[in-house]
A protein has these predicted regions:
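Rossmann-fold dinucleotide-binding core
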Residues: 11, 103-158
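NAD(P)+-binding Rossmann beta1-loop-alpha1 motif at the extreme N-terminus of oxidoreductases
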Residues: 1-71, 96, 132-135
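A generic "binding-loop/recognition-motif" signal
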Residues: 40, 74, 147
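Short amphipathic alpha-helical segments
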Residues: 24-26, 48, 80-83, 110-113, ...
């Protein structure tokens, strides 16, 4: 698979809840400068006030980032992130990777990986554990599975 011309650190995080905000802050400290999106303007403002970059939509984030990390609650929200009217898949380029941090049914994950592969997008199933404090400290646990190419591409963010 041919990778796009995004810099290897072009990473975005969708969902700045307890875990996502801490992950975004940890990536900034590591020098990766993630772009972020959240439906709550106040939490997005909190991140940008600390020097972070926000996108106005999920679609914009998908167009900017080679690595898109979704930190939303469940499969239903992830479906919206991926395929909704402003979803990221329409804007993601072939060779990008979608990292899904929600806990979902394995069959859902397998189906989603196949659908993304049809678009040339790699997929990692990466549920997370550890809580907000550990996320903020860059110490969460990710239980990651997927194609080795997807893992290699996302490795700087994991």
């Amino acid at each position: 698979m041919t990778l796009t011309t995004h810099p290897p650190t072009a990473v975005g995080i969708i969902g700045l809840g307890a875990m996502g905000l801490g992950m975004a802050q940890s990536l900034r400290r590591a020098g990766l400068e993630p772009s972020v999106f959240d439906i709550r303007a106040d939490i997005t403002a909190r991140f940008t006030e600390q020097g972070g970059t926000a996108c106005s939509s999920i679609k914009e984030l998908g167009s900017r980032c080679k690595i898109v990390i979704s930190v939303v609650v469940n499969a239903e929200q992830t479906e919206s992130v991926l395929w909704g009217p402003e979803g990221c898949v329409a804007a993601m380029r072939p060779g990008s990777v979608f990292v899904m941090c929600s806990t979902v049914d394995p069959n859902w994950s397998i189906r989603t990986e196949k659908l993304l592969a049809e678009k040339g997008i790699l997929y990692l199933d990466a549920p997370i554990s550890g809580g907000a404090a550990r996320a903020a400290n860059g110490e969460i646990t990710m239980m990651t599975s997927g194609h080795p190419d997807a893992y290699a591409l996302a490795q700087p963010c994991l």
